[in-house]
Regions:
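A short Gly-Trp-Pro
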Residues: 2-13, 18-160
Length: 160
């Protein structure tokens, strides 16, 4: 049987260290969101989200509190965070079944998961200049146009 370290691809935690987690696999897709809601939630210009199956995430230290907030779809989302420092760890967007949206920069090795796209550039702060060569969208993307075949299959299974 494989040890926990052999089954762990990524580790993450909150700022105070009270919450820790692991991921078994790469996310389905990672993007930088520039919508005004994400700007407000993070008090920053954008957030980097990694979409993955809930089964990929294991909370191995602490507990998470939750708050419910609005989302661009209007369906809302549940934000899971450290109850002490308040760091957001992930969100569960209503209607995405067995998927969660990890706040990528909570990973210890977040540099290994750069965004594969930028979304909601119609609300990007004007002073932010993007110099990367990844796909950019004024709103959101169609998965079929940007996801790999493997990612599309994983999404299909998770949405069942």
């Amino acid at each position: 049987m494989a040890s926990e370290n052999e089954m762990t691809k990524y580790n993450g935690k909150c700022s105070c260290g009270r919450v820790g987690y692991t991921l078994k696999n790469d996310p389905i897709f990672t993007h930088a969101c520039h919508c005004t809601l994400c700007q407000r939630y993070t008090a920053s210009a954008f957030i980097v989200h990694s979409l993955m199956e809930t089964s990929n995430f294991t909370l191995n230290k602490g507990v998470l509190s939750e708050t419910v907030g609005p989302s661009g779809s209007g369906k809302g989302h549940v934000i899971k965070r450290c109850p002490k420092c308040g760091d957001q760890i992930y969100s569960h967007f209503m209607g995405l079944n067995n998927l969660l949206v990890l706040k990528t920069t909570t990973l210890s090795n977040a540099n290994e998961l750069p965004p594969q796209a930028h979304v909601f550039l119609d609300s990007k702060l004007e002073w932010l200049k993007l110099s990367d060569n990844i796909p950019k969208f004024d709103k959101f993307y169609r998965r079929e146009e940007i996801y790999s075949d493997e990612s599309l299959e994983r999404m299909k299974i998770a949405l069942q």
